[in-house]
Amino acid sequence: NNLVSLILNFYEENLLKSIIKSNYFYFSESEQDIVLDKCLTYLKDTSSVEYQVRIEHIYIAALKYITNNKAMILSGFIHFRLSNYMKILDYVVDTFVNELVVDREYKEFINLLKSYVNSKPSNINSVHFIYKNTSSILLDSKHKKIPFTDDLANLNYISDVSFSENDIVLNTLLTLLPQKIIIHLEKEPDEFIKTLICIFENRIELISGS
């Protein structure tokens, strides 16, 4: 148990750093730090699967080694006897690298749409977007229903980052480019509404409890 604690408390962070620098050397220093912080936080979470599994791998390997050897060079033991433990660290690093890449692509997507919105004239003064779990409705300033684009093949602005059924809403808003989008919500803004806020910024007005 003391050996397990020693490895986790004094070696694990450096092992993670080494994996990140070796496999993702093309990431900026700040991006590498983000991945490292997420890995450390996750591995300290006692509810995570990897928390207990990696402890068991170290304990079993250490017990087997000590049974057959009188002395141990710790650095050699870690690098040559803890292959399963190292695979776990590799997996955790890859998981949060993928998360970072998706987040970066999402931000690039948002920035592209923001640039588009800011570069084009508005085609309508204002719209009301009634956003509900069961259905969403788009109304003009006279409260007449605006039809959504229903042909997915003709959606012009869909990216790899998508919002399933909300793609049609996004495409319609990007086609209309209203000066003001009044969003009527039943509950707190979800990820899609937050995305609309990021894209349309001060054009958005939120009304809760509608």
Question: PLM ranges: what are they?
Answer:
Residues 1-167:
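Conserved mixed alpha/beta catalytic, RNA-binding, or beta-rich assembly cores of soluble enzyme
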Residues 142-210:
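C-terminal structured domains
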